[in-house]
């Protein structure tokens, strides 16, 4: 059983994956709030409470964090609480198997890397990956499995909250799909702007990538969405063909397996 930990700016996803290779399957997934000042002890208490008896069946762990301070605590947690469980954390120097054809590879978020790796592995073609999180990342992987770059826009919830915070007449609203693109009250107007506006933003970016990037205009390009807020916008997206809620967890598994294979079938346990 592999423990997968995906730490983002606002929320953290913890998953359990059984099997490996083509037989791997996410059997459990939880979503908890990310606390930037969380300690290793607090993380261990939370995760151990989630996975329960499966803690005794762990054969490996793989994690990433877009919050550097939390990545350190994840490392300490694994070393202290599961010292005999081999682990891989996605950071510079770790083999991901995906070349980063960008100006500064160290700037590329680990989440973007593993998403593109998972999409390329699953579909075997060039791909455009749209991750709906606190930011919307639209990333591009070539038919050779190379990370070409991407575009980053503010996330749906972040943008809606910012509009409410900066405007005296607006308030924070629940993000649900409105009855119409034409709102009949302030709440519906904000919901329409968020849902239909971001659907248009994503479709526009995907279409522009198809038009501007060599090799992406044909039908042999997979367009994949993932992320917690993706289902809110999916019904109104015209360019996205696939939705995979476990894409990042699958990418974490692939990196773990790749590093395990590179060390002749066994990673060194934490010391």
From Swiss-Prot:
A monovalent cation. Ammonium or potassium. This is Type III pantothenate kinase. It catalyses: (R)-pantothenate + ATP = (R)-4'-phosphopantothenate + ADP + H(+). GO terms for cellular component: cytoplasm. K(+) binds at residue 131. Pathway: Cofactor biosynthesis; coenzyme A biosynthesis; CoA from (R)-pantothenate: step 1/5. Its cofactor is NH4(+); K(+). The keyword Kinase applies. CDD domains: ASKHA_NBD_PanK-III (cd24015). Its main location: cytoplasm. InterPro entries: ATPase_NBD, Type_III_PanK. One of its GO terms (biological process) is coenzyme A biosynthetic process. Its EC number is 2.7.1.33. It is found in: Cytoplasm. It is an enzyme of class 2 (transferase). Gene3D superfamilies: 3.30.420.40. GO terms for molecular function: ATP binding; metal ion binding; pantothenate kinase activity. It holds the Pfam family Pan_kinase. Belongs to the type III pantothenate kinase family. The gene is coaX.
């Amino acid at each position: 059983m592999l423990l997968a930990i995906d730490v983002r700016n606002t929320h953290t996803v913890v998953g359990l994956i059984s099997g490996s290779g083509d037989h791997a399957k996410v059997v459990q997934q939880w979503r908890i709030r990310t606390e930037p000042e969380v300690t290793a002890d607090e993380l261990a208490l939370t995760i151990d409470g989630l996975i329960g008896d499966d803690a005794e069946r762990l054969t490996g762990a793989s994690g990433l964090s877009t919050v550097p301070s939390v990545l350190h605590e994840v490392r300490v947690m694994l070393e202290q609480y599961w010292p005999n469980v081999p682990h891989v954390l996605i950071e510079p120097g770790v083999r991901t198997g995906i070349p980063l054809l960008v100006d500064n590879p160290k700037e590329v978020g680990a989440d973007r890397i593993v998403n593109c790796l998972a999409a390329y592995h699953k579909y075997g073609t060039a791909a455009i990956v749209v991750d709906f999180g606190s930011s919307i990342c639209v990333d591009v992987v070539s038919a050779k499995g190379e990370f070409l770059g991407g575009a980053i826009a503010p996330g749906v919830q972040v943008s809606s909250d910012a509009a409410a915070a900066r405007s005296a007449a607006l308030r924070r609203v629940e993000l649900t799909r409105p009855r119409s693109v034409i709102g009949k009250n302030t709440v519906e107007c904000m919901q329409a702007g968020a849902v239909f506006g971001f659907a248009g933003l994503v479709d526009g970016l995907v279409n522009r990538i198809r038009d501007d990037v060599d090799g992406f205009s044909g039908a042999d390009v997979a367009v994949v969405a993932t992320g917690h807020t993706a289902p809110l916008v999916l019904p109104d997206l015209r360019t996205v063909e696939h939705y995979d809620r476990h894409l990042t967890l699958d990418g974490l598994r692939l990196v773990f397996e790749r590093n395990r294979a590179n060390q002749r079938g066994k990673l060194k346990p934490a010391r």
